[in-house]
């Protein structure tokens, strides 16, 4: 299987680059597994964000999360990366990832329409 490219939506790459080095390296490793069609080491489905969205859970003394969707053939889309500061994921983080997924779905739909004309 070919490795899927990563597509960073919104400010997700900048968000991940702001992680401490250990968390950033772990996130990179986990995303490389996903690119190869494998599951990350510690993950959880996030149906409240949208269909097919998965949360990578990174534990390095502080908690970091990366939301992605890999259900599309062409790429792994990274929706959001953030430091988790409370037990429950903040509504703002869930809404941001959800809005980026909505935009992704809209752009993919528009592209398919353009390909048919």
What are these regions (language model features)?
Residues 1-63, 72-76, 83-117:
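Basic, Lys/Arg-enriched alpha-helical interface segments
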Residues 67:
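Short, surface-exposed charged micro-motifs
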